[in-house]
Amino acid sequence: DFKHLYEYYPPVAPTKVGTYSRGYYSNDNFFSFVSDINKDGWPDVLTVGLPNTPAYWYENPGKSFNGPGPEQPEHWTRHFVINAVKNEAPTFGDITGDGEPELLMAYDEHYGYVSPNPVAPTLPWIFHPISTHENVIHHYTHGLGFGDIDGDGRHDYIIGDGWTQQPASLQFGEDWQYHQYPFVNRAGDNAYASLNGGGDMYAYDVNGDGLNDIITSLDAHGWGLSWYEQVRKDDEITFKEHIIMSKQAENTDNPYGVQFSQLHAVDLVDIDGDGLKDIVTGKTYRAHDFADEGAREDPVIYYFRLTQKSDGSAEYVPHKVDDDAGIGRQLVSGDLNADGLPDIVAANKNGTFVFTQRRRSVDQDEWKKAQPMRLKGF
C-alpha cells in the first residue's frame, strides 16, 4: 500500500543546470540499484548522481521495515564507490558472469565497469577499463547496455557507436575487441550531436532466429525507437534496422499511429506472460524543462508487446499504460505485490508512480475493442 516512508539519507538540494527556467536536477540520485553488496543478507542501495558526479552505496542496517518510519530517521551508512560516473544510462548487471552485478559506466577516457572488493566492499570500488583507445568521453553521452551478441556465452558491451566483444580472459587492462556500428545517429552540426543516443540498450533475440538483436531508443531528447536485427554472413556480424517509432515528429513508421519523444529509459520485461520480453518505455516528463522536441505532448507510458510471426519476422504492438505520469531517467518493472504479474515503477519531476498490473476476464467483443487498431496504408 506504500503508506510507510523510510528515509535512508538526508535530503540534498537539487542542482540547476543550463538556462532552462526549471532546469533543476537531482544531484545525488539519477539512478538507484538494489543489491546485497556486503553479503549480510540485507539489500543495500547503490546510487548514481548527475553525470560526472560520484556514486555511493548505502548500507542497510538490517532492521524490520514492517511499520511506519521513525520520526527521526536513522540514516544508513554511506560508502564511497567512485568519484565520477560518465554516461546518462549507467546500468547495473553481471557483465562478467561471476554471479555478481557490476556498475557499467564510462570513466575518464574509457568505457568499463566498477565492482566492489569482495573482501572489503566498503572500500572504494575498482574500475576495470575494457579499452584503452578512446578519446575523452563526454559525461553526457547517451546509451549503454550489455548482452551476448556473438553467441559465445559471454556478455558484450553495447554503446551507441557499436559493441565491444568480451574476451575469454578478463585480465585487468586487456582491450576488448571493438566493432563499430551506428546504432544511433551522432552526425550533424548540432554541438551535442556526438552525445546522441537513448537510454538502456539491450541484446535480445527479437525474431526468434537464435541470434541476439539490439534494442534501443535513438534520442533521449528527441525521437525514435528501433530494433536492429543481427545478420550473419560467414564470420561477419552486421545489423538491419527495424523502426518501431519514427525518427522525427511525424509518424511514418508505426502502423498503430503511436509516436512520442524523449525515451530516456527503456525496460525489457515479459509483461503478458507469453515468454517473450516486451519493451516498456515512455516520454520523459520535462527532461530539459520544455526545451526538447515534443516536450508539451502527453507524458505517456507504453509497453510494446513483442509478437513473433511464422515467417521469421517480428512486430511490436503498442499498449498504453498511462498518459499523465511520464518517465524519468530510470524505469523499472517487477512484481511489487507478489501476484505473479510484473508492475511498473516510474519517477521524475512529476512525482513517483507505481502501475500495478491487473487482469480480468472479458468477452470476445470487449477484448477486440481493447486491441490497438492498425492504420490504413501500413
Which residues make up each language-model segment?
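Beta-propeller-forming repeat regions
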Residues: 1-378
